[in-house]
Amino acid sequence: MGKHEAPAQEFGYGFRGRMDERYDMVRSVVGKKFIYIRNYMPHKPYGQHVSYMFQTPTTQVWKKMFDEGKLNEAQSHFWKTKPVEELYDLTNDRDEVKNLVKSRQHVDILKKMRKAHLDHVNQIIDVGFLPEGEIHSRSQGTTPYEMARTDKYPFKRIFLAADMASGLSPWATKTLSTYLKDKDS
């Protein structure tokens, strides 16, 4: 505030690494009108089984109705796997129901927000692309922030593999299988 106030940024950035006892990996970019979401574990549903959540009767009934096929598309969304990318117009779709990733009218905003996401994870050297246990073992004697800025964390290689694997493209399988032989895998 005052003379030390920083200028407003074009985007804010979000991070999800876990949901209680479940691991998930989501990054997001939010602007004045749109939110871009990149799911790095799209094979997992939004609604993974979290013990505390399933103690509530409402959640139990909701999941049972989903399993029985009694919900509409919007009601079922939480229990389904995620798309690799999501883009929502927060002005016209506050509930984030209509994913605009495939919309021709939104190609430019998608590219802009995707680039902002990629720039951000590279700028901060996002350590979230390592499992928690690996972050701790590589950071012994230092902090994850400091470890990320050493050769203990080959970020570009790890990020490339994570981005490719989570993209769910069949063409990536051959390349990804060679990564299994990497000395750091």
Predicted regions and their residues:
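Generic hydrophobic/packing signal
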Residues: 10, 15, 32, 99-101, ...
